[in-house]
Amino acid sequence: MKRFKNIAVYGGGSFGTSLAAIAARVCENVTLFLRDEEIAKEITDKKTNTKYLGNIKLPSNLQATTNLDKIKDFELIIIAVPSYAFDEAIKLLKTHISNDNILLIATKGFARNPTELFSDRLKTLLSNNPIAFLSGPNLAKDLAKGLPASATIASLDIDLANKISYNLSSEAFVASTINDVITLQVAGALKNIFAIKSGIDMAKEQGENAKATLIVSALKEIAILSKALGGMKNNMDILLEAGVVGDLVLTCYSRSSRNTKFGYEFGISKDKQKFLQEYKELVEGREAIKLVLELIERYDLDMPIVSSLGNVIR
């Protein structure tokens, strides 16, 4: 299988920088495209991104720039921006790329206004490019350090997914492939909601059994929403993928999970309403609850965990 001659990553946060490091370990020509000139210079000159990844050393061949003019020259473009910035990022990239650029979407969550999957939003915003999605149990700092990790790459074109996997996989990073883009996106969006529930359970000292019960119940709700949106066509194996159960377990029980931390602090707070009003950190699951409640109502779904959280977290 042919190797990509170059790989670009769009998004200079912790996850984007870490994915750029993954790519740079298997591809000589890798450039991270971002907006912050100071961070771009630091990555190029010092091989660090201290704002997001501390003093972790990045691969020596990794370059960074704020100039989007050359991004069209890269065979693969990995998009790693927050879900709220997705539309803006795609609209901007559209003016700088051609239909030949392969796009790998690493953003997790839902598109907004209206609430829908990113694969559906891309049909409107950018319909002609080859597209795949990446998701997995991938803590950014571990990826940046080159520690062992796995992920799942999904595309309606399984040959494309296999090609991307071949070009990103290494001894430390293994990417499996599937053609169910819907379930992978649903799992990536819902996991943060279930992580909030995990934190609340910890605060209530629900015990170890409750942890396993939550994972089972969460997988059921992932399947319910995925099927409603057209995924999981007679194939339950997708639930065993790194990008589904792997990502779910990590997000629910990692000490560094923002969503689990939020759930725990909410659970121990005396004044719940005051806590919600004063909590200023970004919590993806909190916003996702609102969006999934829309889908539950739209498709008349029975998803008790999400619904119960929606009653107490607004």
Curated annotation (Swiss-Prot):
Reactions catalysed = sn-glycerol 3-phosphate + NAD(+) = dihydroxyacetone phosphate + NADH + H(+); sn-glycerol 3-phosphate + NADP(+) = dihydroxyacetone phosphate + NADPH + H(+)
Any one GO BP annotation for this protein: glycerol-3-phosphate biosynthetic process
InterPro entries found in the cross-reference section: 6-PGluconate_DH-like_C_sf, 6PGD_dom2, G3P_DH_NAD-dep, G3P_DH_NAD-dep_C, G3P_DH_NAD-dep_N, NAD(P)-bd_dom_sf
Q: Name one GO cellular component term.
A: cytosol
Q: Which positions does UniProt annotate for NADPH binding?
A: S14, F15, R35, K108, A140, R258, L282, E284
Q: Where is the active site?
A: K191
Enzyme Commission no: 1.1.1.94
Keywords of this entry: Cytoplasm, Lipid biosynthesis, Lipid metabolism, NAD, NADP, Nucleotide-binding, Oxidoreductase, Phospholipid biosynthesis, Phospholipid metabolism
Q: What does this protein do?
A: Catalyzes the reduction of the glycolytic intermediate dihydroxyacetone phosphate (DHAP) to sn-glycerol 3-phosphate (G3P), the key precursor for phospholipid synthesis.
**What HAMAP family does the record point to?**
NAD_Glyc3P_dehydrog
Q: Which PANTHER family match?
A: GLYCEROL-3-PHOSPHATE DEHYDROGENASE, GLYCEROL-3-PHOSPHATE DEHYDROGENASE [NAD(+)] 2, CHLOROPLASTIC
Name this protein carries in UniProt? Glycerol-3-phosphate dehydrogenase [NAD(P)+]
Specify the species: Rickettsia bellii (strain OSU 85-389)
**Name of the gene this protein is made from:** gpsA
